[in-house]
Amino acid sequence: MGSLPVRIKRLRATPLPAYMTEHAAGVDLCASLSADFVLAPGERALVPTGLAIELPPGFEAQVRPRSGLALRHGIALVNSPGTIDADYRGEIGVILINLGSEPFTVSDGERIAQMVFARCERAEFIEVDELGDTARGAGGFGHTGR
């Protein structure tokens, strides 16, 4: 597995992201809070991480939910995956939502999401009058599962 140089800046005292196992695809992001807060069922909040990154051109970072929080507490990300573009230099924030039935306390330093790095290509759009035919055609949602 190769490595990607990513410049990172701590905006507050917060743990640096780390891979938790040898072959983990993502690093954990932690909440960087001055005080814990409660996320009520159905409520969402932007949770700061205290981190900013500089990605090389041609890469993005994807912010994804943690499966354990989803399974045990119904905690998810509203926009999953969230995209961090290579030219973004602000603080990484995570939009959490409580889809569970119980209030959930978000604590400072708690692992709230994971971040995965990926190459990305820029599309060059070529406007045409017709698109090529396929067996699927315009079959949409649920089409391949019938």
Curated annotation (Swiss-Prot):
It catalyses: dUTP + H2O = dUMP + diphosphate + H(+). Signal peptide: none annotated. It is an enzyme of class 3 (hydrolase). GO terms for biological process: dUMP biosynthetic process; dUTP catabolic process. Pathway: Pyrimidine metabolism; dUMP biosynthesis; dUMP from dCTP (dUTP route): step 2/2. Gene3D superfamilies: 2.70.40.10. Its cofactor is Mg(2+). Its EC number is 3.6.1.23. Keywords: Hydrolase, Magnesium, Metal-binding, Nucleotide metabolism. Belongs to the dUTPase family. This enzyme is involved in nucleotide metabolism: it produces dUMP, the immediate precursor of thymidine nucleotides and it decreases the intracellular concentration of dUTP so that uracil cannot be incorporated into DNA. HAMAP family: dUTPase_bact. This is Deoxyuridine 5'-triphosphate nucleotidohydrolase.
